[in-house]
Amino acid sequence: MIKISIDAMGGDFGPEVVIPGAAKAFERHPDIRFIFFGLPAQVEPVLARYPKLKEASEFRASEVAIGMDDKPSQALRAGRGKSSMWQAIEAVKTGDADACVSAGNTGALMAMSKFCLRMMSDVERPAIAGIWPTLRGESIVLDIGATIGADARQLVDYAVMGAGMARALFEVRKPTVGLLNVGTEEVKGLDEIKEAGQILRDTPLDGLEYSGFVEGNDIGKGTVDVVVTEGFTGNIALKTAEGTARQMAELLRQAMSRTLLAKIGYVFAKGAFDRLREKMDPNKVNGGVFLGLSGIVIKSHGGANAEGFCSAVEVGYDMVRNRLLEKIEADLAHFHHSHSHVSSKA
């Protein structure tokens, strides 16, 4: 049995999307047990529509719901100990839940997670890791918005954590890792990126294969299993990709409805277009993982639909089932030991 705490008030639509999304996840994974946190007047009527889910879940009342526009400091002051977001995170800290899922305010969720859950040993900054659809399947990109900027040491930690996530999710023994840069040549890029690349080249690691620098167009190609960058660049890349996917879907729709011949052609090609639309749908790869914390916290898109929220829950489920935290902590300990050994020889 895997226990997942849910911030039922999170996201643009709150319980009206969160609970149906959880119900979908429960249908697919009957061994999940949910703890919902939220305002009773809004959560209980929706939960009552799903009797099987309600029977296998627990509801705990909250006093406060964190707004999508609340500043992190404001959210901490107003919501510590009594908001649905805080209580869902705290359930992981106390051991009541194995993972937390929220579609709420990203800044508030990160601030509360860092405040409530301790950081992993030797990790200075957390990162948000996202699953990215590619021509070869899927890859992991981090950081996609936890913090702005990162030094070489932090980028290397992201690489180790991202590789651990790739092994847990994709069952790849030795994931390939690339540092996002403006070119693939070793002389290009910011000093911190070049230094991180040097560290990854010089340190022997069993858990990842460093493939050098990658460019923006390599993300969608699936050139590597894990793409590492800092949060400012990563978030821009994410939003650009999501916008491009929606633009392409709309352009296809317009092209297929422009003439009678195009409409007839669409009838015959509908299956292929449906598969393409599904592949490009951001809801299908929803769920950013907060890496570097001592507990599992999953961030769903605020505007996700029920299927999208279900995807975020399934990411949390897979993280717990594959013992992500234990693997990443072991990888980080091995890396820091290996790097200190290499540095002492230099």
Curated annotation (Swiss-Prot):
Its EC number is 2.3.1.274. Catalyzes the reversible formation of acyl-phosphate (acyl-PO(4)) from acyl-[acyl-carrier-protein] (acyl-ACP). This enzyme utilizes acyl-ACP as fatty acyl donor, but not acyl-CoA. Belongs to the PlsX family. Keywords: Cytoplasm, Lipid biosynthesis, Lipid metabolism, Phospholipid biosynthesis, Phospholipid metabolism, Transferase. One of its GO terms (biological process) is fatty acid biosynthetic process. GO terms for cellular component: cytoplasm. It comes from the Bacteria. It catalyses: a fatty acyl-[ACP] + phosphate = an acyl phosphate + holo-[ACP]. GO terms for molecular function: phosphate:acyl-[acyl carrier protein] acyltransferase activity. Homodimer. Probably interacts with PlsY. InterPro entries: FA_synthesis (IPR003664), Phospholipid_synth_PlsX-like (IPR012281). This is Phosphate acyltransferase. It is found in: Cytoplasm. Its main location: cytoplasm. Pathway: Lipid metabolism; phospholipid metabolism.
